[in-house]
């Protein structure tokens, strides 16, 4: 069965962006379509962390701006979104809980550029996400796909090919700006 979102972006789903810097040097922009039509809760969680609409307990904006891609594995994926601890251990949601349930597994990890939730097991979605750099069908049914890269796959490839030590980038890969288009 063909993925219902294997083509260009729709007119109704939100488009968000990350501006990326590597070691303080701007690399460019990644634009992503969020599949709000298939995974509305997951897409909205990510969208609000992109726009800064989400507030922490002190009423301050929280989200992906100035956070890192903390895990990079060539020929697999790039992972980020831990603005809580910055190292892959933090979790936060817009729903007032540290984690939320898997919404569905309708969409598949069938190509590079798939945007999916990182987790630590069933129903442990938070703020962390990853972008695939190849098809990863072994993740189907385990991680919720909620978007796709629509522009800037060259930037994803630059991140994928950055030098790492034990899957951690040697230089900081920072989301310097983010928001909704």
Curated annotation (Swiss-Prot):
Give yes or no: UniProt keyword Isomerase. yes
The SS bond pairs are none
What SUPFAM superfamilies does the record tag this protein with? Cyclophilin-like
Tell me if Iron-sulfur is a UniProt keyword of this record: no
- Catalytic class of the enzyme: isomerase
Query: Which catalytic reaction applies to this protein?
Result: [protein]-peptidylproline (omega=180) = [protein]-peptidylproline (omega=0)
Q: What is its EC number?
A: 5.2.1.8
Quote the protein name from its UniProt record. Peptidyl-prolyl cis-trans isomerase H
Q: Which organism is it from?
A: Aspergillus fumigatus (strain ATCC MYA-4609 / CBS 101355 / FGSC A1100 / Af293)
């Amino acid at each position: 069965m063909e993925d219902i979102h294997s083509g260009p972006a729709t007119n109704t789903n939100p488009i968000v962006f990350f501006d990326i810097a590597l070691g303080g040097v701007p690399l460019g922009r990644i634009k992503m379509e969020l599949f709000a039509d298939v995974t509305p809760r997951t897409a909205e969680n990510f969208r609000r962390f992109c726009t800064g609409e989400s507030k922490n307990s002190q009423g301050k904006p929280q989200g992906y701006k100035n956070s890192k891609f903390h895990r990079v594995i060539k020929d697999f994926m790039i992972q980020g979104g831990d603005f809580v601890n910055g190292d892959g251990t933090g979790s936060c949601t817009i729903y007032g809980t540290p984690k939320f349930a898997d919404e569905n597994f309708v969409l598949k990890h069938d190509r590079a550029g798939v945007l999916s939730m990182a987790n630590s097991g069933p129903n442990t979605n938070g703020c962390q996400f990853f972008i695939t750099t190849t098809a990863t069908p072994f993740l189907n049914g385990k991680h919720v796909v909620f978007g796709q890269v629509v522009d800037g796959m060259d930037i994803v490839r630059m991140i994928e090919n950055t030098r790492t030590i034990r899957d951690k980038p040697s230089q900081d890969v920072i989301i310097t700006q983010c928001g909704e288009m």
